[in-house]
């Protein structure tokens, strides 16, 4: 199922995206977000996350940097890693930069 979804996303990017133009207000683009979500979380949860993202992508959205959330197992591994450093509120802007895209 994952391969089918990735194939459909690739067909969209090659066949339809050039005609629609770059209109996504987020980074990564919605199609890249969908691909990353399916690869990170699997076809069911990845499709759900992609659908939520598509609902947030509209002309009145502020946009900006919106990465795929890490998988539950990835977050647990990072929190128990002794080499990882703790982040504070002062580090938050550096960890997630705010990118505002120009509006057409």
Curated annotation (Swiss-Prot):
Residues 78-98 have a biased composition (Low complexity). GO terms for cellular component: plasma membrane. Keywords: Cell inner membrane, Cell membrane, Membrane. It is found in: Cell inner membrane. It is a peripheral membrane protein. Its main location: membrane. Residues 71-104 are annotated as: Disordered. Pfam families: YidD. The keyword tRNA-binding does not apply. Could be involved in insertion of integral membrane proteins into the membrane. Belongs to the UPF0161 family. HAMAP family: UPF0161_YidD (MF_00386). This is Putative membrane protein insertion efficiency factor. It comes from Ralstonia nicotianae (strain ATCC BAA-1114 / GMI1000). The lineage of its organism: Bacteria, Pseudomonadati, Pseudomonadota, Betaproteobacteria, Burkholderiales.
